[in-house]
Amino acid sequence: MRRHERLIVAAAILGLLTLWEVLARIGRIDATLAPAPATIVESLVRLLGRPEVRASLAVTGGEVLAAFLIAVPTGLLLGFLLAEVPVLGALVRPLVNFLFGVPKSIFLPVFILVFGVSIPQKIAFAVFTTIFVLVLGGIAAVQSVPRELVLVSRVYGASRAQIIREIYLPAMAPILLESARLGMVFNITAVLLCEIYGARDGIGYRIAAWGENLQMPQLYAALVIVAALAVAINEMLRAIETRLGAWRQRA
């Protein structure tokens, strides 16, 4: 996004927040359901100062990280195998495509029955929710590799390790990283869904509790925290993608 475009977006957001603040203060908006932005900011500062809220954020962050570290290598490896082994791909890909299109939330009660309401249940459900987009991303990444370059490399005696390092990885990197970024969105959503639906800790659990008790400033403040963390993670992955893009061009 160009600088002037960022300025326009920032000005639009600031204008909306100012309008929201004014309407809430003069009573045109029900402050019980939509408290003024200044009130939300005050609640945000108070929440970040509470040890139990920071502990809940740490729990959610740990679950998201654990699920991501399991889902990414597993999903991409499965995608690589399905693309490289035609028989396996013919057998498994229809199931992967089917499950990818099914809302994963319908399986949440099954995970609760199997694992109970626990951290392993949340991690397992997040992995299940995330892995399909990574498998499909792995398949697409392998299919993006120029086959003529692979054949020429083999003719000139390149080893399999050299082919993977010099041809496969540079060609696959953009799709793999884009799949990882998209997978993180599924991952965070799955963990929060578990915590809101049934959990004893985590920021999703607290969001559900504040919503049920109509503690709207705390609810909105928590949503701001989650959104900010999600954007930060996405931008971090985007920065990695940009750096690896430069490496890909050199390769």
Protein language model regions, located:
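C-terminal transmembrane helix and the adjacent membrane-cytosol boundary/short C-terminal tail
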Residues: 86, 143, 174, 178, ...
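Loop-to-helix entry region at the N-terminal start of transmembrane alpha-helices
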Residues: 55-63, 113-134, 177, 218-223
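Periplasmic/extracellular loop-to-transmembrane helix junction in inner-membrane transport proteins
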Residues: 2-3, 26-72
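Short cytoplasmic-facing helical segments at TM-TM junctions of multi-pass membrane proteins
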Residues: 137-182, 207
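Transmembrane alpha-helices
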Residues: 124-128, 160-194, 221, 233, ...
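Hydrophobic alpha-helical transmembrane segments of multipass integral membrane proteins
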Residues: 7, 11, 15-19, 54, ...
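Cytoplasmic-entry segments and transmembrane alpha-helices of multi-pass inner-membrane transporters
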Residues: 76-112, 136-145, 151
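Glycine-rich helix-loop "coupling/hinge" segments at transmembrane-helix boundaries
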Residues: 113, 142, 189-226, 245-251
